[in-house]
Amino acid sequence: MWLPLVLLLAVLLLAVLCKVYLGLFSGSSPNPFSEDVKRPPAPLVTDKEARKKVLKQAFSANQVPEKLDVVVIGSGFGGLAAAAILAKAGKRVLVLEQHTKAGGCCHTFGKNGLEFDTGIHYIGRMEEGSIGRFILDQITEGQLDWAPLSSPFDIMVLEGPNGRKEYPMYSGEKAYIQGLKEKFPQEEAIIDKYIKLVKVVSSGAPHAILLKFLPLPVVQLLDRCGLLTRFSPFLQASTQSLAEVLQQLGASSELQAVLSYIFPTYGVTPNHSAFSMHALLVNHYMKGGFYPRGGSSEIAFHTIPVIQRAGGAVLTKATVQSVLLDSAGKACGVSVKKGHELVNIYCPIVVSNAGLFNTYEHLLPGNARCLPGVKQQLGTVRPGLGMTSVFICLRGTKEDLHLPSTNYYVYYDTDMDQAMERYVSMPREEAAEHIPLLFFAFPSAKDPTWEDRFPGRSTMIMLIPTAYEWFEEWQAELKGKRGSDYETFKNSFVEASMSVVLKLFPQLEGKVESVTAGSPLTNQFYLAAPRGACYGADHDLGRLHPCVMASLRAQSPIPNLYLTGQDIFTCGLVGALQGALLCSSAILKRNLYSDLKNLDSRIRAQKKKN
């Protein structure tokens, strides 16, 4: 009885998918990935004026190119990558950035003669031959050079009543697994099951991409029938918490903590994070970490020329006040604040890389914010974790100070959820004394070009989770004029964290030249991150639910307004890149994933011939 019904449903679904595919990818736009554009990396450009011409072109009305095809709001990598892909397809694109320098979380800034990154601490899967490296090479013409971190690439430090324990995460699958088993010899079978599950789940990530192409009613029907989670391990794991899966595997509390150590890279504790998100990140880094040679500003520096060569531009100091809508409610341009005046820029397509909250709550006119589709999307997500970043100038080279390229994650409790919940619910005056976790690293030790550019000196960065509410009373104050109470409170986190680092690296005593800290308010100012949430919308179980994932797509409820970046897929450079591919596919009406696969196959076939 059921077999004919199932077969009928399968035939109908196949027919729908065929119709959807033809409708989505029926465009006649040129293929942006028609040929291999990779070339050997050019020498690192260190001339400040040359870099300024690319990264710091200030907005003025006469700098706006004529006959624009697309305007992109925000120059984070999700915006730049989408603009570059569209430029490769012949589109003239203008990217507008509110900050003084392009790049978003990829931009760098100078402090006391040294350079600091703002968001790129390490990237996985950037070895030659990986799909992520291949896509970036095609966007930047192979000009990004990636330096591998040493092994172990991460060390989890657990400070407990019985002393300190360290758990190294070694590069390469075999070494990674062996390192875990050496620390937990009684739980080898559990570790094997965990790794197998990570690989199975992460291999299904394309299913999340497929969801964003299917019509929402089809996704909802498949979800109600239980078919999404039945046939996709990734989507099944999107409904299970990390803590739930580790408990089902039978891991001890200490092993659960160690396997969960990387959660700060997506900002959600084990009870509230989806195992699918965790599996993606673990698999992403299992072969090791990489860092852009020359620093993270290289990413924007080598993406912007692709946009410019197609007649486009990337302009800074360009705060977009609103998305312009025509009488039919379609996006038709943007309004940019220039001094006390507004400059209207008209174009057929607007792309927002400003995130869901900025786009829907601040950039849309009031009547558009009330649209059911807009309200529905905002109702399914919330801002993520806030961070305080600490930037430290050190006297001495990495050899002098014995600085590794390894990242450190320091914890004080195996129950990470309880520790974080207790911490964020504390009165702010007590919080600095109970920091539950700390990330720190030495960016200067990761970059092979550092010593040539900044001889005799080094840098360190620390990241501390902090509640936005603790800083909220100063949100209306101007940057740099928030008063002594703000500085004292912010510095309480710095002092507490520095004491931890100096215990692990006592050789740094007396080598600190300067310390600068940025609170969630700093992220809000420089990155336009609502509530200082550097990862955008929270990556919790709610956001990773298959139906919510499907609804967070490039096509917005406003015709001709598209979304790109980390809110469309996941956080991180590669997540933002996926958002850009989804956005560009929707605009060009091309399956860019298929285009990339075809190009990769042709390149591999050519290499075999040679």
Curated annotation (Swiss-Prot):
Gene3D superfamilies for this protein: FAD/NAD(P)-binding domain
A single cellular component GO annotation: endoplasmic reticulum membrane
Membrane topology recorded in Swiss-Prot or TrEMBL: Peripheral membrane protein
Tissue localization of expression: Expressed in liver; expression positively correlates with obesity and liver steatosis. Expressed in adipose tissue; expression tends to be decreased in obese versus lean individuals.
Cofactors named for this entry: NAD(+); NADP(+); FAD
Gene Ontology terms describing biological process: retinol metabolic process
EC number in record: 1.3.99.23
EC supergroup of this enzyme: oxidoreductase
Matching InterPro entries: FAD/NAD-bd_sf (IPR036188), Retinol_saturase (IPR052206)
Catalytic activity: all-trans-13,14-dihydroretinol + A = all-trans-retinol + AH2
Record carries keyword Flavoprotein: yes
Chief location bin: endoplasmic reticulum
Keyword 4Fe-4S: no
GO-annotated molecular function: all-trans-retinol 13,14-reductase activity
Signal peptide: 1-18
Subcellular location: Endoplasmic reticulum membrane
Keywords: Endoplasmic reticulum, FAD, Flavoprotein, Lipid metabolism, Membrane, NAD, NADP, Oxidoreductase, Signal
Similarity field: Belongs to the carotenoid/retinoid oxidoreductase family. CrtISO subfamily.
Role description: Catalyzes the saturation of all-trans-retinol to all-trans-13,14-dihydroretinol. Does not exhibit any activity toward all-trans-retinoic acid, nor 9-cis, 11-cis or 13-cis-retinol isomers. May play a role in the metabolism of vitamin A. Independently of retinol conversion, may regulate liver metabolism upstream of MLXIPL/ChREBP. May play a role in adipocyte differentiation.
Descriptive protein name: All-trans-retinol 13,14-reductase
Organism: Homo sapiens (Human)
